[in-house]
Amino acid sequence: MDRISAQKDIFKKVVNKENSSIFVSLGVFAVSVAILKSRLGNFLVPQL
């Protein structure tokens, strides 16, 4: 729970400092990277 609350505080600081559009684009980029990592992991782990 502490980690989630810390992330929310960071998100609030980012939103306050940057435009919401930039924050949304960064969020979408992070999600896409996470999906790519999960897919690559699924492909590479069985091969190893």
UniProtKB/Swiss-Prot annotation:
Lineage top rank: taxon: Eukaryota
Sequence intervals crossing the membrane: 21-43
GO cellular component, one term: vacuole-mitochondrion membrane contact site
Swiss-Prot/TrEMBL keywords: Membrane, Transmembrane, Transmembrane helix
GO biological-process terms attached to the record: protein import into mitochondrial matrix; vacuole-mitochondria membrane tethering
Major site of localization recorded for this protein: membrane
Compartment annotation: Membrane
Membrane topology: Single-pass membrane protein
The protein's name in its UniProt record: Uncharacterized protein SPAC823.17
Source organism of this protein record: Schizosaccharomyces pombe (strain 972 / ATCC 24843) (Fission yeast)
